[in-house]
Amino acid sequence: MSHNHIQLNTIEEAIEDIKAGKVVIVVDDEDRENEGDFIAAAEKVTPELINFMATHGRGLICAPLTQKRCKELNLHPMVTNNTVLHQTAFTVSVDLIGNGCTTGISVHDRAKTIEALIKEDTKPEDLGRPGHIFPLIAKEGGVLRRTGHTEATVDLARLAGLKPAGILVEILNEDGTMARLPQLVEVAKKWDLKIISIENLVAYRMKHDSLIEKKEDFEIDTRFGKFRLRAYQQNTNKQVHIALTKGDWNSNEAVLTRINSMLGNNDILDALSGKLDIRIEAAFNKINEEGKGAILFINQEEVSSSLLKRLSIVKENDGKLDLDTPKLTADQKDYGIGAQILHDLNISKIKLLTNSEKTKRVGMTGYNLEIEDYIQY
């Protein structure tokens, strides 16, 4: 497949190289970081591999790990309030204590530290903090949740049949500037490396995996009129997400769409009881004016199993439900889950109802979603 008309390798080819202990280059969306990273599996780490990454990558060598592994090693987030643009989930940096390690910065020491991060008998106290290796917490669900190099690294290792952990480093040009796609292609040729895109990795995984399962599908009467409600349960954490749609469309049609960052539990109940946030009320009105469209409620609650029970009551009572539920603080929208829901709704082109154009665009093309227009409201 190609990226900006440049021929890239297939995901299958990259998986085979990761399995063989080789380095691959992974590029992301030009609307995101527009960078390339050297990526390898942690299980295949050697001092020589670290030296190659440090010498020819020139960026910061990091070790993407699963949330589960980070908890096992007591690797807490580096900061309590992550304000970096794409919320890369750095933990406190580490060095392996002892085992022949001294300063922690040599390629030997860094390779040993990465080995320790995936060894089952490594204990939290075996790791000195801070150190010279920077673990990254990958989102559960991988690139289907977040189109980042962190998730791509863990996904590729897992797809190669290895432990879900890896090594990455950003690739810089010799003058210290970021290497963009044309330079990355030359780097790949020079070192005979495979080069793939996160966009293609997402497409590969969407063909083979799904993070959602439809649990409910029925017509519902709201104060904004009749809508079709679909409830989806996320298999990584059992959260329940809601899609409310009006009208019909074909697969090539750009559909008016709002991806809502508030909580599904509260939003759907407030839609029925008349206590809905004014911005979402405006979205309903826009869709009614259009005659068709979709509103997604991406649930941010830790536990949302009760939502399916509540929706069952809503269905049985024709939408006559008045429950007073507490408001919870929402995190950023989960566009990976939203993308899978949109694909299930036969939506690939959207007219996005939004107030902040730039942040909505980040990473979206990786999910094969084309934003044809931004509708301000």
Locate the predicted segments by residue:
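Catalytic domains of riboflavin
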Residues: 1-377
